[in-house]
Amino acid sequence: MKKLTTNEIRKMWLDFFKEKNHHFLEPVSLIPVEDPSLLWINSGVATLKPYFDGRKTPPSPRLTNSQKAIRTNDIENVGVTARHHTMFEMLGNFSIGDYFKKEAISFAWELLTSDKWFAIPVEKLYITVFNEDIEAYEYWINDIGIKQDHIFRLTRDTNFWDVGQGPCGPNTEIFFDRGEKWDKENIGPRLLAEDIENDRYIEIWNIVFSQFNNDGFNNYSELPRKNIDTGAGLERIASIFQDTPTNFETDIFWPTIKQIENICDANFKYSIENYFDEKAEQTKINTAFKVIADHVRATSFAIADGVFPGNKDRGYIIRRLIRRALMKGMELGINGPFLSTLVINVIDVMKDFYPYLLEKQNLIETTILIEEEKFLKTLSKGYEALNKMIENDKKVTGKNALLLFESYGYPIEQTIEIAEDRKVKVEIEEFNSLLEQAKEQARNARKDLKAWDKQNEIFTKINVESEFTGWEETSHKNAKIVYIFTDDEILTEATDKEVYVILDKTPFYAEKGGQAADKGYLVNKEARCEVIDTQQGPNHQHIHKILLDGSIKIGDQIDAFVDETKRTLTMKNHSGTHLIHSALRVVLGETVMQSGSYNDEHGLRMDFTYNDSIKAEELIAAEKLVLDKINEKINREVYFCSMKDAVSKYGALAFFTEKYDDIVRVVKFGDFSSELCGGTHVDNTIDIEDFMITGLESKGSGVYRVKCLTSKKAINEYLNTEFNKLLKLIQEQNSKYENTKLIQADQNIENIVKESVTKTISKESIQELKLILEKLSAALKIYERKIEDLLTSKKLEQFKAFEPITNDKGVGTIEQQVNGLNIKDMKNLVDEYKNKFEKLIIILTSETEEGNFVVVGVSEKIQNEYSAIEIFKNLTISPKGGGNSSLAQGKF
């Protein structure tokens, strides 16, 4: 059999299907786009959903890809099984209403067995089919020539793909027989027939025949357009061609494993032979190597695609992978950060097909190193907190486990492992319940979805043509109405109601890429329509949500007018977003990467990644750089080109969380800024007029959000509002001082207030007033403490003349009412008397608006004979409280 590298296998697959007229789809980001149902891209077909459900027209009915994917539902199995991975590559070929069963089976067989391609011996291949799929079974037997003892008809459990509702169908699977060496009990084909987990028969290809629709009640009807969805695990195929016990000894992971051997304690080595030897200690060592190699690969790709360690969603998964790998390193005697040094091994293996990893190398290494260092600190703090919990409660409550998770970022898996070592229980059900409550709150906050986000049947049927003209115009005469619908039905006409309409040509920008939707009006003789929102449809149509006054029908001509004021302000802010992004990359470094943005007529905000603290002077420098570029009067340039040219020829920044078409739009402002962007922008940077950063906040885990304004009018309004707001806050603070000034004046406060009066409205004065407010607040706190101490001292003075009544043993007793004193003042008074008299029992009571209090004190010298807590318990007023032999306190 051929010996093929992973790169050769991938290339051969893609070349084969290109010869069969399949369009090659470049691999996309691990972060799903416009699919809230998925946390990660988890299969090859996940990226093709819009093509299969009709929302978008595919570039070809025949498609092929090699798509990276992540599945994290059972991370704990990684390293334990032979073929389980966090991230994997799925080879696929797909037909959308084109070929079906016979062609799909023929293609698979040709690629696997032809001497030109994989050249796998026919006798090594076994097939399974759904037992009711006679067509597929007979084709395998009669046309392909599979022997009866090499094909098995299995049940719905193994050979029918169905998620409960929607398209579904039977599937056929192809297995490779690795031979008796991998079948210790010599069970043979029964392993397949009875679906027994094994390492002899390796599934290399799954072909799903999507031919039915499940109505949700298990009623099945034939689909009018049948599809093919296939998947073949690249790592599994590599293991077959390289004849390795598991996927981890292939050329994908082996360089990383060998590098781990160089880093770890010399006593630890990876053993290939242990697959057969099964020595428990070596199995544990091998597992650690596998986990590290797997997790560092998945983490590297995720970070390159814009996911950073955090405490929720994808960020938590990446944090968990890094921390789990770091813990496995400790099992191999590695006690410091080391994962970042393995990134280069991952890149060397994967760079041919994923060249962008090289560009992201510094970002990946820095992010992982920072997270490693954080976790080493977290381990120490979290471990201390966990120990206290175990000592105090003899268990870990769900509430405490959540506290460790949220406050310390301490993984629940780590809490469980440590608790098990200490033989104590973790109330995991309570933890899961509390965690689910937190998630539910987050989900509820996101439930305000637009009608078209429901992707209902009406929406997916939209296939009319619509052209966007709004890059160069804000109005369009005689546009034709080509589609009218509501949430519930498709219409041919409408009168006086809220509906959605599509025009053959429209200047209205649909919300996308961080830019808010245009609003405005549609007008003709019969109707005036207020456009209150614009969103993008399944094939790039711009869908207008309108409040209709009058009547419209399909085919009507109508004039479209965008709200120019809103559009102009939005354009300034969108161009400002591009400039501040470039400025931050200049000031902070090219590891800065935009991870989200939003701009409308009110301002702009941009989220970006940066793994360090940001100094005020760095923000000032970025703001100044943007202002410089505005004043340089740089013309906007726009180019339509291929993605390759956009990056190589025009230096455009592309964000891997976005999906791009074959032809992309590049927006450039000289050599300073070049980005892929479909939004509207100013013609020249001078049109932005002005620029100001109004805020910076950390979103956690290396993600920041910067908020900015453009245009002189918006900035002047902001400065006026902020200036007056800050002055009001300063005046409020000063009023607190004035109310107590007669007790004791404070020159420092008066000087600070005088300083604020000298300021006039400007960008600089806003920052200065903020500093003045901070200084004033701090000075006022010190002043208030002084006044409180002074008033307390005066209040206590009237109660300092009590004299004890002394018994024959020389022990004095003071029993007095000190009404108006709080418990703190009473304790201070008791301490003063105890210091004044060596042998004293003192009992003070106080009636206040907050309640009635009692404090009992006993001097240290007589505590062998008298106890404050015992005296407290025997008081006739029956107080409730506690204490010790020296002091007791409570209420009555």
From Swiss-Prot:
Location in or out of the cell: Cytoplasm
EC category: ligase
Major location (coarse): cytoplasm
Binding site for Zn(2+): H574, H578, C677, H681
Biological process according to GO: alanyl-tRNA aminoacylation
Gene3D superfamilies named in the record: 2.40.30.130, 3.10.310.40, 3.30.54.20, Bira Bifunctional Protein, Domain 2, Threonyl-trna Synthetase, Chain A, domain 2
Pfam families assigned to the protein according to its UniProt record, in alphabetical order: tRNA-synt_2c (PF01411), tRNA_SAD (PF07973)
Family affiliation: Belongs to the class-II aminoacyl-tRNA synthetase family.
Domain notes: Consists of three domains; the N-terminal catalytic domain, the editing domain and the C-terminal C-Ala domain. The editing domain removes incorrectly charged amino acids, while the C-Ala domain, along with tRNA(Ala), serves as a bridge to cooperatively bring together the editing and aminoacylation centers thus stimulating deacylation of misacylated tRNAs.
The name this protein goes by in its record: Alanine--tRNA ligase
Organism: Mesoplasma florum (strain ATCC 33453 / NBRC 100688 / NCTC 11704 / L1)
Gene that this polypeptide is encoded by: alaS
